[in-house]
Protein backbone atom coordinates (compact mmCIF):
# COMPACT_ATOMS: atom_id res chain seq x y z
CA UNK A 1 0.00 0.00 0.00
CA UNK A 2 0.96 3.59 -0.37
CA UNK A 3 2.68 4.44 2.89
CA UNK A 4 6.27 5.59 3.04
CA UNK A 5 7.40 2.64 5.14
CA UNK A 6 6.24 0.33 2.34
CA UNK A 7 6.96 2.31 -0.81
CA UNK A 8 10.41 3.33 0.45
CA UNK A 9 12.92 3.35 -2.40
CA UNK A 10 10.95 0.91 -4.58
CA UNK A 11 11.12 3.19 -7.63
CA UNK A 12 14.90 3.53 -7.43
CA UNK A 13 15.36 -0.22 -6.95
CA UNK A 14 12.95 -1.09 -9.77
CA UNK A 15 14.75 1.24 -12.17
CA UNK A 16 18.21 0.05 -11.09
CA UNK A 17 17.31 -3.65 -11.38
CA UNK A 18 14.95 -3.34 -14.36
CA UNK A 19 12.23 -4.85 -12.16
CA UNK A 20 8.48 -4.53 -12.48
CA UNK A 21 6.34 -3.65 -9.45
CA UNK A 22 2.97 -5.37 -9.16
CA UNK A 23 0.56 -3.42 -6.96
CA UNK A 24 -2.89 -1.85 -6.77
CA UNK A 25 -3.83 0.28 -9.77
CA UNK A 26 -3.70 3.68 -8.05
CA UNK A 27 -0.28 3.07 -6.52
CA UNK A 28 0.91 1.51 -9.79
CA UNK A 29 -0.04 4.70 -11.63
CA UNK A 30 1.83 6.85 -9.12
CA UNK A 31 4.97 4.68 -9.24
CA UNK A 32 4.83 4.61 -13.03
CA UNK A 33 4.69 8.42 -13.06
CA UNK A 34 7.98 8.33 -11.13
CA UNK A 35 9.63 6.05 -13.72
CA UNK A 36 8.96 2.50 -12.48
CA UNK A 37 7.53 -0.28 -14.63
CA UNK A 38 4.34 -1.58 -13.02
CA UNK A 39 1.57 -4.14 -13.36
CA UNK A 40 -1.67 -2.70 -11.94
CA UNK A 41 -4.02 -5.04 -10.08
CA UNK A 42 -7.06 -4.97 -7.85
CA UNK A 43 -8.45 -6.87 -4.89
CA UNK A 44 -9.56 -10.31 -6.02
CA UNK A 45 -7.41 -10.07 -9.13
CA UNK A 46 -4.68 -12.59 -9.79
CA UNK A 47 -1.74 -12.59 -12.13
CA UNK A 48 0.30 -15.51 -13.39
CA UNK A 49 3.88 -14.38 -13.74
CA UNK A 50 6.74 -16.46 -15.08
CA UNK A 51 7.41 -18.48 -11.93
CA UNK A 52 4.71 -17.41 -9.50
CA UNK A 53 1.05 -16.58 -9.24
CA UNK A 54 -0.08 -13.66 -7.12
CA UNK A 55 -3.58 -12.81 -5.94
CA UNK A 56 -4.47 -9.66 -4.06
CA UNK A 57 -6.80 -9.73 -1.07
CA UNK A 58 -8.51 -7.16 1.05
CA UNK A 59 -6.66 -5.48 3.91
CA UNK A 60 -8.27 -2.99 6.28
CA UNK A 61 -5.85 -0.06 6.43
CA UNK A 62 -5.31 3.43 5.03
CA UNK A 63 -3.18 4.06 1.96
CA UNK A 64 -1.76 7.41 0.90
CA UNK A 65 1.51 8.98 -0.16
CA UNK A 66 2.96 12.25 1.08
CA UNK A 67 4.58 13.64 -2.07
CA UNK A 68 6.43 16.80 -1.03
CA UNK A 69 3.63 17.86 1.32
CA UNK A 70 0.76 16.81 -0.92
CA UNK A 71 -1.26 13.81 0.24
CA UNK A 72 -2.07 11.51 -2.69
CA UNK A 73 -4.64 8.72 -2.43
CA UNK A 74 -2.85 5.41 -2.99
CA UNK A 75 -5.78 3.06 -3.54
CA UNK A 76 -6.91 0.31 -1.23
CA UNK A 77 -4.45 -1.50 1.01
CA UNK A 78 -4.06 -5.17 0.15
CA UNK A 79 -2.77 -8.49 1.29
CA UNK A 80 -1.26 -10.91 -1.19
CA UNK A 81 -1.28 -14.65 -1.79
CA UNK A 82 1.92 -15.79 -3.50
CA UNK A 83 1.98 -19.30 -4.97
CA UNK A 84 5.05 -20.98 -6.45
CA UNK A 85 5.95 -24.64 -6.90
CA UNK A 86 2.72 -25.70 -5.18
CA UNK A 87 3.39 -23.67 -2.02
CA UNK A 88 1.41 -20.64 -0.91
CA UNK A 89 2.43 -17.74 1.31
CA UNK A 90 -0.15 -15.23 2.54
CA UNK A 91 1.22 -11.81 3.43
CA UNK A 92 -1.70 -10.08 5.16
CA UNK A 93 -0.26 -6.60 4.69
CA UNK A 94 -1.01 -3.87 7.19
CA UNK A 95 -4.49 -4.82 8.31
CA UNK A 96 -6.94 -5.18 11.10
CA UNK A 97 -8.78 -8.44 11.61
CA UNK A 98 -11.65 -8.97 9.16
CA UNK A 99 -14.04 -11.89 8.82
CA UNK A 100 -13.21 -12.63 5.18
CA UNK A 101 -9.91 -14.05 6.42
CA UNK A 102 -12.05 -17.14 7.02
CA UNK A 103 -12.73 -17.31 3.28
CA UNK A 104 -9.07 -16.77 2.42
CA UNK A 105 -8.25 -19.77 4.61
CA UNK A 106 -11.16 -21.82 3.30
CA UNK A 107 -10.30 -21.36 -0.39
CA UNK A 108 -6.50 -21.52 -0.16
CA UNK A 109 -4.09 -24.08 1.25
CA UNK A 110 -1.71 -21.68 2.98
CA UNK A 111 1.73 -22.91 3.95
CA UNK A 112 2.90 -19.72 5.66
CA UNK A 113 0.88 -16.72 6.82
CA UNK A 114 2.65 -13.50 7.69
CA UNK A 115 0.52 -11.47 10.09
CA UNK A 116 0.87 -8.07 11.76
CA UNK A 117 0.94 -7.96 15.56
CA UNK A 118 1.95 -4.34 16.20
CA UNK A 119 -1.49 -3.03 17.23
CA UNK A 120 -2.31 0.69 16.98
CA UNK A 121 -2.14 0.80 13.13
CA UNK A 122 -2.85 -2.91 12.49
CA UNK A 123 -4.24 -5.85 14.41
CA UNK A 124 -2.51 -6.70 17.66
CA UNK A 125 -1.45 -10.01 19.16
CA UNK A 126 -4.89 -11.34 20.14
CA UNK A 127 -6.54 -10.51 16.81
CA UNK A 128 -3.54 -12.01 15.01
CA UNK A 129 -4.16 -15.31 16.82
CA UNK A 130 -7.77 -15.27 15.58
CA UNK A 131 -6.56 -14.51 12.04
CA UNK A 132 -4.09 -17.41 12.22
CA UNK A 133 -6.90 -19.75 13.28
CA UNK A 134 -9.14 -18.62 10.41
CA UNK A 135 -6.35 -18.85 7.82
CA UNK A 136 -5.21 -22.31 8.89
CA UNK A 137 -1.63 -21.96 7.69
CA UNK A 138 0.92 -24.63 8.53
CA UNK A 139 3.28 -21.93 9.86
CA UNK A 140 2.69 -18.33 11.01
CA UNK A 141 5.18 -15.47 11.16
CA UNK A 142 4.60 -12.15 12.97
CA UNK A 143 5.36 -8.81 11.31
CA UNK A 144 4.86 -5.08 11.71
CA UNK A 145 5.98 -4.75 15.31
CA UNK A 146 8.86 -3.05 17.16
CA UNK A 147 9.71 -0.77 14.22
CA UNK A 148 8.49 2.29 16.14
CA UNK A 149 7.74 2.74 19.87
CA UNK A 150 4.00 2.99 19.14
CA UNK A 151 3.96 -0.59 17.77
CA UNK A 152 6.15 -2.20 20.43
CA UNK A 153 5.06 -5.79 21.07
CA UNK A 154 6.56 -8.95 22.52
CA UNK A 155 6.65 -11.55 19.74
CA UNK A 156 7.27 -14.28 22.31
CA UNK A 157 3.89 -13.49 23.88
CA UNK A 158 2.35 -13.92 20.41
CA UNK A 159 4.21 -17.22 19.90
CA UNK A 160 3.13 -18.54 23.32
CA UNK A 161 -0.53 -17.71 22.63
CA UNK A 162 -0.31 -19.19 19.15
CA UNK A 163 1.21 -22.43 20.45
CA UNK A 164 -1.38 -22.67 23.25
CA UNK A 165 -4.07 -22.39 20.56
CA UNK A 166 -2.50 -25.38 18.78
CA UNK A 167 -0.82 -23.50 15.93
CA UNK A 168 2.77 -23.19 14.77
CA UNK A 169 4.70 -19.96 14.65
CA UNK A 170 8.18 -18.73 13.93
CA UNK A 171 9.73 -15.44 14.99
CA UNK A 172 12.14 -14.32 12.28
CA UNK A 173 14.92 -11.77 12.48
CA UNK A 174 16.39 -9.69 9.70
CA UNK A 175 18.30 -11.99 7.36
CA UNK A 176 16.61 -15.19 8.55
CA UNK A 177 15.33 -17.64 5.96
CA UNK A 178 12.56 -20.21 6.10
CA UNK A 179 12.04 -23.29 3.94
CA UNK A 180 8.51 -23.41 2.54
Residue ranges and their predicted role:
Residues 20, 32-46, 129, 133-180:
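Binuclear metal-ion centers of metallo-dependent hydrolases, dominated by the metallo-beta-lactamase
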Residues 1, 9, 21, 54, ...:
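Divalent metal-coordination and catalytic microenvironments
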Residues 1-6, 61, 91, 144:
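Histidine-centered active-site/metal-ligand motif
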Residues 10-13, 31, 101-104, 158:
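Hydrophobic packing residues within well-ordered alpha-helices of enzyme cores
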Residues 41-105, 173-180:
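Core dinuclear metal-dependent hydrolase active-site scaffold
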Residues 78-135, 143, 147-149:
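Metallo-beta-lactamase
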Residues 1-17, 24-26, 30:
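Di-metal (Zn2+ and/or Mg2+/Mn2+) metal-binding site signature of metallo-dependent hydrolases
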Residues 15-20, 87-89:
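Short active-site oxyanion
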Amino acid sequence: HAHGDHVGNAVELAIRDDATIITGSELAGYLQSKGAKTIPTGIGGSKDLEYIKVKFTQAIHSSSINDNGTIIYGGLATGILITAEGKTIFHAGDTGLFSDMKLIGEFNKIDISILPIGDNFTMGIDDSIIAAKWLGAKQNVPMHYNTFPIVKQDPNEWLDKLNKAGMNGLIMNYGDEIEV
